[in-house]
């Protein structure tokens, strides 16, 4: 098993973190339950002393036509998958043109934009070497019900790439900030929006040391420059406390915190 050092202050999308050892996994038999897969670190906040980090290597970066479905390796990124579906006139993953991440993380969090999400197109996934049908994965709003590493997945093939869906997803992205961030900080509560709640407690544009909630959209935690893990964690906890006190609603993080 190979090992490398990754500086997460450069590698992660929010540009917060420290140089850490990361195992590079190239075969199914190298996977263990202890591994915390980082992918492209787009939706992660990583503590400076976390252990057992790993990523899937080049053997998992592939897309293959299997006749009735398309098989995608766990390390293939969203852009690569989007381009394949568009080039082959396949519908269902148009939203990946506006999302970051690798296949494994996209399945694990049932990634999506509004009503467009992974589970609508997914057929099955290979988790820790075992193929599971979609129904067994417990996919829900930005979450799943399984433990383990997604090594590959299969998607149904329906012809007819939808340019209108891509256009709608591009429009949604216009409100996203340019500063380093990890996407939505919190999941939307049932029948409400995390951004509305955060704005309601005065956190839109609010700064705490070197982190803040974006002026463009309150549900985006941004790195103002040189921020550290504890600063981001403090702001997340502050937001949860304020929203709970004002609205009686427990906000749940969409960002995955590794510590």
UniProtKB/Swiss-Prot annotation:
UniProt record similarity statement: Belongs to the MurB family.
Cofactor or coenzyme needed: FAD
Coiled-coil regions listed in the entry: none
The keyword Cell membrane appears for this protein: no
Any matching Pfam family: MurB_C
Reaction it catalyzes: UDP-N-acetyl-alpha-D-muramate + NADP(+) = UDP-N-acetyl-3-O-(1-carboxyvinyl)-alpha-D-glucosamine + NADPH + H(+)
InterPro entries: FAD-bd_PCMH-like_sf, FAD-bd_PCMH_sub2, MurB, MurB_C, MurB_C_sf
Keywords carried by this UniProt record: Cell cycle, Cell division, Cell shape, Cell wall biogenesis/degradation, Cytoplasm, FAD, Flavoprotein, NADP, Oxidoreductase, Peptidoglycan synthesis
EC nos: 1.3.1.98
Catalytic residues of the enzyme: 142, 184, 254
Pathway the protein acts in: Cell wall biogenesis; peptidoglycan biosynthesis
Species: Helicobacter pylori (strain J99 / ATCC 700824)
UniProt GO molecular function: flavin adenine dinucleotide binding; UDP-N-acetylmuramate dehydrogenase activity
GO terms under biological process: cell division; cell wall organization; peptidoglycan biosynthetic process; regulation of cell shape
Functional note: Cell wall formation.
Listed name of the protein: UDP-N-acetylenolpyruvoylglucosamine reductase
Location in the cell: Cytoplasm
A single Gene Ontology CC term: cytosol
